[in-house]
Amino acid sequence: ERVFLDTWVGRQSHGLFWRHYRIAGEDGAALLYAVSIWVIMDIESRALTKDHAWAVVSRVTVEGELPAAFKSIPFPRELAERSSRRVTDTETDGNGHLNNCLYLRWGQDLLPEEFARTHALRSVWIEYRKELPRGTESELTYSLSGSTLYVRGTAENKERFLLRMEYDETV
């Protein structure tokens, strides 16, 4: 089966940049639509960039475009399980921080083996609070409640991220 990916720059506001993604089948029907919101930094100065001209390549209007909205996601205050993890060299991005996609791996690594074999990931929600630099030891508190994994990552007494992963049973 062939699929097609379209991506385009959306609006920008207060240093935030929207990027839209659409995956469609050969018949043109949308299989997936997503919006990501980015904050762009200068790597050397670690400051938000002031020159945003690069982000506006062209404006494209797509009918039915989803609005990007910040919604509060229910997240438990207390999580019973504990683990820890150190950010390794191979887990870092160009800024020297834990690569964004690896938060998911950290979450998946906490799942019981039987659960991981019998469930498929349905949805992910991540709230990044503060970066995790190379070598940082992070305390992970977590809980598997039904088919939802909740993970809170802290380091140096600061909350760094919240992760919620929802699963569907496959067997």
Model-derived regions: residue spans:
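HotDog/MaoC-like acyl-thioester-processing domains
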Residues: 2-75, 128-135, 143-171
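A short alpha-helix capping/helix-coil boundary motif
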Residues: 72, 82-83
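Acidic/His-leaning functional-site neighborhoods
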Residues: 79, 85-167
